[in-house]
C-alpha cells in the first residue's frame, strides 16, 4: 500500500496545483503587504491538534521566514493529553484567553489551519482575529461543509469566516486509503499534514518572491548546520524576539 499512498499524495497535490494557485497567490500577497507596514511586522499561524504542526512547520525553520509568530497553546496540542486537546478544540471560550497571550496587531495576517473547519476553537480563532482587526487566511478541506455540520455556535464553518480560503483538497475523514476484506472495511493513512505543509511552503515561497521583487531582503533563517549561520540567525532573532513569543 505504500505506493498507493504516494499516488494519493500526488493526486491531491496536483489538484491543489490545478485549483488553488490563485487563492495561494492572493494569500501570499495579502501577507507580504502586511509585513511591509512596520519594521517588526509578523504574520501568525494557528492550528489545533495535529494541525498545530502547521505553525511549527513555518517557525524557526531553515530556509523559512523569521517573521512568523506561531500560536502554540499546550491546551490544544497532543503532548499534554490527547483527549484534553480534542475537548478544547471544540471549545470556543478558550480562544480569547489564548490570543491574549500573544501580540496580535491590527492589519496583520493570521493563517488558521483546520482540516475539517468545523470545530469551535479554530472557527472562534477566525472570529476573534477579525474582531482584533487581523486578516484571516484559512487552510481547510471544503468536503466537510458538504457532508457534516459545524460545531461552532454560529453554525458557520471556518471557510465562512476567513478572508481567503485555500482548499487543501483532502478527503472527508482525512484517511487516503481504504481496504475491504470480508466484513472488514478500514480507512487509514491521513493526508492533511502533508497537504497543509505543501500549501504553507507555497505561500511562504511566494512571500519571499514578492519581497525580492520589491527589492527587499527577506528575513530568512539559514540552517544552523552550515558555516556562518549563527551570526546571521541571531540578528533575525534580535529583530523579532519581542514579537515572536516562542523565540
UniProtKB/Swiss-Prot annotation:
Membrane-traversing stretches: none
Listed Gene3D superfamilies: Glucose-6-phosphate isomerase like protein, domain 1 (3.40.50.10490)
Coiled coil: none
GO terms, biological process: carbohydrate derivative metabolic process
Disulfide bridges in this chain: none
Superkingdom classification of source: Bacteria
Domain SIS: 31-213
Gene Ontology molecular functions: carbohydrate derivative binding
HAMAP family the UniProt entry points to: UPF0309
Family: Belongs to the UPF0309 family.
Protein name in UniProt: UPF0309 protein Teth39_1980
Organism phylogeny: Bacteria, Bacillati, Bacillota, Clostridia, Thermoanaerobacterales
